[in-house]
């Protein structure tokens, strides 16, 4: 099998990822579980050749120099793929994350109405958080798609690498890839403020400078979307504040309290009957939440989210209960992700 055939097999079987690892057969991840493909183990030189077939000269140089590299590529008519190539103890390895060619809508994802209300805001910061593989990129792509179809503005994305490719509809869209179109997130964000955007998507808030620039952009009339690998709204606020030196923390709390529109923390769970569905914790930046951020009372946020349903807020446990009630997930699956596991016994 060549790489195109392996990827076609992966897509046909609705796999989220294809794994190539020297010394082992190719494997695919389907509904969260890794499964072997029934073909012989691949040698190092085979995996190396499969990876090199789809790399540009620059990507090959990066791989040789740094022993790992990230990039994306597309097989027309099939899908786009986000690739990480690396080395391991048996030789070459690579993971291909499938990025569907078609962007799912907010309706497709079952997003609650508050998602649309949030992205109708003229400015502020919306954070989508969760572990790797929790569907953050899919949720953000649906938000960008909604804006693209319903608003007249300039959407600027900064990604590493570009995953979903958006075709300009009502909006002007410019998508920039780190290491190809810009040297880094902070450089691209600094430049973005002079590129007349209405909406800015930052693939990942990786460091102090990127977070600082994202807060500044949100304060100065832009709607900014970003991601973090945190698992809850409270942990997200802590992570952002903790990045800054002690002397700057009060100022950052003030900036964040003014600009934060929402934190959406998500997990991806197995659905009854196959497939996966997202479970969300949603914290909206209402005055009570802003005060808690400003006064460094993050521990009290959970109870505010619990009682804030009239504002579109919900805890992860509340959403898990709803998903179980609707028969979309099992109680054991909900219990695995729940904060209060007694709810699902």
Name each model-derived stretch.
Residues 1-345:
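Short, flexible helix-loop junctions that flank or precede catalytic/ligand sites
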């Amino acid at each position: 099998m060549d790489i195109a055939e392996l990827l076609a097999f992966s897509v046909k079987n609705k796999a989220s990822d294809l794994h190539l690892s020297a010394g082992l057969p190719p494997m695919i991840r389907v509904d969260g579980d890794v499964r072997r493909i029934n073909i012989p183990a691949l040698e190092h030189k085979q995996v190396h050749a499969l990876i090199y077939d789809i790399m540009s000269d620059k990507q090959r140089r990066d791989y040789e120099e740094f022993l790992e590299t990230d990039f994306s590529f597309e097989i027309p008519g099939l899908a786009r793929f986000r690739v990480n190539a690396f080395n391991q103890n048996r030789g070459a390895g690579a993971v291909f994350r499938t990025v569907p060619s078609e962007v799912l809508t907010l309706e497709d994802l079952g997003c609650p109405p508050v998602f649309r209300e949030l992205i109708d805001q003229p400015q502020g910061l919306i954070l989508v958080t969760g572990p790797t593989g929790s569907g953050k990129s899919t949720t953000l792509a649906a938000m960008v798609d909604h804006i693209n179809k319903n608003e007249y503005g300039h959407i600027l994305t900064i990604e590493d690498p570009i995953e979903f490719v958006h075709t300009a509809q009502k909006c002007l869209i410019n998508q920039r890839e780190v290491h190809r179109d810009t040297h880094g997130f902070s450089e691209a964000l600094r430049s973005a403020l002079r590129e007349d955007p209405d909406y800015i998507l930052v693939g990942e808030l990786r460091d102090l400078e990127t977070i600082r620039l994202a807060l500044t952009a949100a304060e100065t009339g832009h709607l900014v979307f970003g991601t973090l690998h945190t698992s809850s709204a409270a942990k997200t606020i802590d992570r952002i504040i903790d990045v800054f030196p002690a002397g700057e923390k009060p100022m950052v709390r003030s900036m964040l309290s003014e600009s934060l529109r929402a934190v959406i923390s998500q997990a991806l769970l197995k659905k009854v009957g196959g497939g996966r569905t997202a479970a969300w914790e949603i914290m909206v930046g209402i005055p009570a939440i802003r005060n808690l951020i400003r006064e460094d009372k993050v521990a009290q946020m959970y109870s505010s989210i619990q009682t804030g349903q009239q504002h579109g807020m919900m805890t992860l446990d509340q959403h898990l209960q709803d998903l179980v009630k609707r028969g979309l997930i099992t109680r054991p699956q909900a219990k695995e992700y729940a904060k209060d596991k007694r709810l699902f016994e």
